[in-house]
Amino acid sequence: MLITIISAEHSLRSKWVREYFASKGYEVKMISVNTSSVHSFFAKIHFLKQLRKSLDALSPNLIYCGATIDFLMRELTVYKNKNNNVKLVFDVCDDIHVDQKYLNQADYIFCASESCRAYTHGAQVLYSTNGQSCLNTSPELSKEELFFCLIGNKNIDMNFCVSFLRECSILKQCTLHILGDWKLKESFIQSVLSVGVNVIDHKDLDSQSTRQDVYDQCHYGLNLMDFEGINSESLEYMCGQIPIINSIEGDLSQFCKLWDIGKNIDAQNYKIVASNICAESLDVQLNRRLHMRNLYKTYFTKDKFFETLDEIGGSL
C-alpha cells in the first residue's frame, strides 16, 4: 500500500505521520508545500499542475494532507472523485478556518486542538508531538530568587516579556535563562538587563539532558508569543516539565486552568500574576511540574500520537 503525505514545509507533524505509516509497513512518499509561495494565481496553477503529475505517477492508496489550503483541498477532492479507490485524510494543523464542504469529502479528519475542532465538524483531535519522552528531573529551585526560561522564537512578544519581568524584578531578584537564537535577541537581552533582570544566554543546546538541567533551575518558562495553537516551544516546555507563564489562547489556556500547569497572562492581569508568583511557595511550583509531566504523558507523547492515528485503520 502506498501512502502519499502532503504537508507544509516545516510542519511539526509530517515527520511523525511518516514514521507512523512506515512502522505499519506501508510505502510512504512525501510532497512538500511552501505555503508562503503559492498565494498568486500563477503559483497555484503551477503547483497544482505538478501535484497532478505526481499523484498520477504515484497512484496512492491513501492521501494524507496536512496542508489544508482551500485550493489544495479542492484539488484533492476532485482527484478523489475521479479515483474512487483512494482514501483521503485531511489534517487541519492550524487554528484557521477551512471550508467545511471540502472537509466533508474526506474519509477521515484530524485537527490540531479542541479549539480547532469547534469549527472542524467531524474531526478527531490529534495533538502534535516532538517525539521525546520526559527525562527524570531534579529541580533545585531558589527561595530567594526567581529564575525564568525563554526558548527563542521569532513569534516571542518581546515587549510583553520585558514588561512582565520588570514587574517581577520589583518584588524579587530575577534571572532569565535564554535558549536558542532569533533575529532581535541581542536587542531583547539589553531590554531585559535594563529592567534589572540578569540574563544567562545558553544559545543552542542540542542535548535534551542539557536543556533539562536548565529547566530544573527555573521556576517558570515564558510562553509569551504572538501565536495561536501549540507549537514546538510549548511542547518543549511540557516535555521539560517546567510550568509556564502563558499568553497563548485556546487549548494551552484551558490546560493552564484545568491542569494547573502555570498562569495565563494578558495585558490586564500581568501585574497581578507577577505578584502572585513572587509570593507563592515552592510546593506550589513543584506540584505544577508534576502536573505538566502528567499532561505531557497524557496527550503529547509519540505513543499517544500513533495511538490516535490508529483510528484511520478502519478507512484503509
Task: State the predicted function of each range.
Residues 1-35, 108, 166-171:
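N-terminal subdomain of nucleotide-sugar transferases
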Residues 4, 53-72, 86-89:
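Short N-terminal targeting/anchoring amphipathic segment
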Residues 14, 47, 62-83, 96-98:
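An aromatic- and histidine-rich active-site surface loop
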Residues 32, 97, 104-137, 151-152:
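Donor nucleotide-sugar binding/catalytic pocket of nucleotide-sugar-dependent glycosyltransferases
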Residues 110, 139-169, 177:
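Conserved donor-binding/catalytic core segment of Leloir-type glycosyltransferases
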Residues 186-209:
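Nucleotide-activated donor-binding/catalytic signature segment of Leloir-type glycosyltransferases, i.e.
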Residues 213-229, 242:
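Acidic donor-binding loop of glycosyltransferase active sites
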Residues 268-273, 282-316:
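A charged, aromatic-enriched C-terminal amphipathic alpha-helix characteristic of glycosyltransferases
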